[in-house]
Amino acid sequence: VLDNTDLSAAERQPPLQADWKGCLADRDQPYDASSEPAGILTSRFVAAKCHVSSLAQMEPLTTDLEAIRTRAQSMTPDGYTNIAIGYTMGLATLRANSEFGSAAATGPNVKKFMIVLTDGDNTRNRWNSDAASIDARLSAACAQAKTNAADKNVTVYTIRVIEGNEALLKSCASDASKYYNVTDASGLQPVFKKILESIQKVRLTS
């Protein structure tokens, strides 16, 4: 469910129920820190005009690795950094009852994982460009995820590439061992290998 009542006239798009092809912006606070499905009007996802045309489209959950590779390769560094919206939307896609697809329901035989990767500090959200206030919204999202029944069963890995708030990203990981600091882009492949190995280990021993 999308809403656009809090955007400027130039940014507003007609309210739609599902088939939105534009961009999404932060939800009204405090829902911007939550992955919960939209309910009341102020919790709805905001249909926003895309200010950067090169942004890659979100890829639904899939087992098609080639589709994932293609989508990843289509990404280009542009625009601002808003880790909080990526964090909450990522968790939302892993919910069985979300607007984003058909994830399996949480259960003893279902393991869910999310990797948050960033190469910079928060620079802009829907309201301002104050890094400290945006960091606070990300911190709120991470804290809420660790207590929410649906989200706390998701194992979250965070990866800081060269730049970013190290303490904040570490706190957003499920635990300190799932935070990785990469000082050069060439170090990403070994990190992803470690993460894959840890996921496979969980799958084999659970």
Spans of features found by a protein language model:
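Divalent-cation-coordinating short motifs within acidic/hydroxyl- or histidine-rich contexts, strongest
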Residues: 1-112, 116-117, 121-155, 167-170, ...
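Short beta-strand/turn micro-motifs composed of small residues
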Residues: 118, 160-162
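Conserved residues at beta->alpha junctions
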Residues: 160, 182-183
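Terminal peptide-recognition signature
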Residues: 195
